[in-house]
Amino acid sequence: MSPLDLLDIFEGHTIARRKLRDELQLFMKGERSVEKYREAGISWWDYCGSILINSYPTYFERLPSLIEKINREKRCSKNYVLFLGETGAESNQVPCLSLVQFQIEDDGLVLSAYQRSSDANLGLPADIYHLYLITRQIDLPLKSITLNLGNVHIYENNIDKTCRLLAGEEGVRFDLNV
C-alpha cells in the first residue's frame, strides 16, 4: 500500500481512530491491565480477564527503543525487526501480528509485516492502522507498507454484516467473536 492509499482508507472510512491510537500507546507502555484499556474506552480485551498475558503489550513495549534506534541510526544496510509472540508461551491472546520489519531504502521507510491470523472485519483494519501509526513515529518518509497474511477469516456472526458492507451500506458495525 502506498501512503496515499492508507490516507484514503483511514480518512475515508469509519474506524475507531482515537481508541486505536490509545490502544497502541498502552501497548507500547507495556500496559497489561485490561482495566486500563477499559478506562480508555476500549472494551474488546475484556474477554481476556484482568491481565493480558504474553499478548501485544509484552512485545510492543520493545517498540519505543527500536523506534529510537531506527531514528538515531537510519542505516540502510540493516533491517530492524520486532518479533511478537513466543512458541509455547502461555497466553490469553496470542498476537495475530507476528513480525514487523523496518527497512530504510533510498531515504524512505519500507515497512513489511507478517500477520499469522486476521479477522478481516476487526483485527485486520486495526492492525493496519497500528502499523501506519508506528511508521509516523519514524523520522523518514513512508514509501510503503506490505502486509503478508497467513490466515484471513470472517466469523460466522459477521457474515451478513460483511455482505451489507460490501454492498455499499455505511455505518455497519461488527461484533467480536469470543
Label the model's feature ranges:
Residues M1-V178:
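Terminal, non-catalytic protein-protein interaction segments that mediate quaternary/complex assembly
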